[in-house]
């Protein structure tokens, strides 16, 4: 009985309160409508009043505004503001260090060591001087690496792109952050050498890959100055460029890359290191300039231009670099 009565009393109380509230709301309906109309009127009239009062105040007080502007632009006011700013910066709570250039310079890079690997012929395409030139263009984090290892050689591994992809994949597993330098020699009598630097290991893919750190390069052996002087007629821009001489002012140098002339190994010097090809295709023993005359190699790089992102594109049948 007691539990049942306790359950009935709240329902009766709630019903009574709802009826009383409905009667009260019915009696207060006109007042609510009046307050709503007043709030709507003030909502539309307040912005207009604010704008009109602002314009009136600006038009009726021109002297005060001009005086305030003069005071703000006065030399004394500027000097006080500067003193306050200096005092705030030199306060003991704020420490402003004095920065000067460090007299210490980073140490020079250690010489490169080219490791051809077993079963590779003594005569190779890459010289140490050419490798040092390529090293200056690779990312700074990889310039500290002083040992370059041969991953693939046409003479040792055969003409197979799948073998090239496989060997580069093995190197990427051992060194995930390694870079890759591609060296190619054409079949022309001059034996020009060209190649590229690749940020990623070459592998078959359906899309372009690589970053803006990739670049192309080429190197060629320059003829001796005596041969250049014997050429009759005006010298072309290509001959001037190969000789290491500056181009004429009329030449288009908009897309000119990095060019360097460097001295290669001596002719006929077979020390077992990676060496550059000879310009005449011979061994250099019967060269007219003598066996001790060093070669001059023309190096030119073509960095990322920013036009597109077509860096590397490889498939099972071809390898493309700088497609854009």
Swiss-Prot record:
Protein name per Swiss-Prot or TrEMBL: Oxidation resistance protein 1
Residue stretches making up the TLDc domain: 124-324
GO cellular component term, pick one: nucleus
Family: Belongs to the OXR1 family.
Region described as Disordered: spans on this chain: 1-35, 63-113, 244-292
Record keywords, A-Z: Mitochondrion
GO biological process: response to oxidative stress
UniProt cross-references to SMART domains, sorted A to Z: TLDc
Biased composition (Low complexity): 9-29
InterPro entries: TLDc_dom
Pfam families on file: TLD (PF07534)
PANTHER family hit by this protein: MUSTARD, ISOFORM V, NUCLEOLAR PROTEIN 7/ESTROGEN RECEPTOR COACTIVATOR-RELATED
Provenance organism: Aspergillus fumigatus (strain ATCC MYA-4609 / CBS 101355 / FGSC A1100 / Af293)
Source domain of life: Eukaryota
